[in-house]
Design a protein with these regions (language model features):
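Basic, Lys/Arg-enriched alpha-helical interface segments
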Residues: 1-66, 74-81, 88-103
Length: 103
């Protein structure tokens, strides 16, 4: 899969240094694997779930559920654009925002 930018990972590593190994591991899985569909990705990332307030956005728990990654994923084109890597509190705030600000 082509991860469009590493910047969100670098920023998350700086903000959450205790989760750095898990973030690097996740980035490596995304960059080294090819996933034809969400079910195949879920076999590597069991926490993968649809972010229901945006089309083609997905959520992955990171570092034992310490962080959440929210990303646009196009399985046909093999592209991932990470929108946010945040704590659960920030994830709840973002969910509330996207719920009330529809596309």
């Amino acid at each position: 899969v082509h991860v469009i930018s590493r910047k969100p990972f670098n920023e998350a590593i700086a903000s959450f240094p205790g989760c750095a190994i898990a973030l690097v591991d996740l980035l490596n899985v995304l960059e080294k694997k090819t996933f034809s569909d969400p079910q195949e990705m879920k076999s590597y990332l069991p926490s993968l779930d649809n972010f229901k307030y945006r089309k083609k956005w997905w959520v992955v728990d990171v570092a034992g559920n310490s962080l959440r990654l929210i990303a646009f994923m196009d399985f046909r084109l093999q592209k991932v654009f990470v929108k946010h890597i945040v704590s659960h509190a920030e994830y709840d705030r973002l969910t509330k925002y996207y719920r009330s600000h529809t596309e």
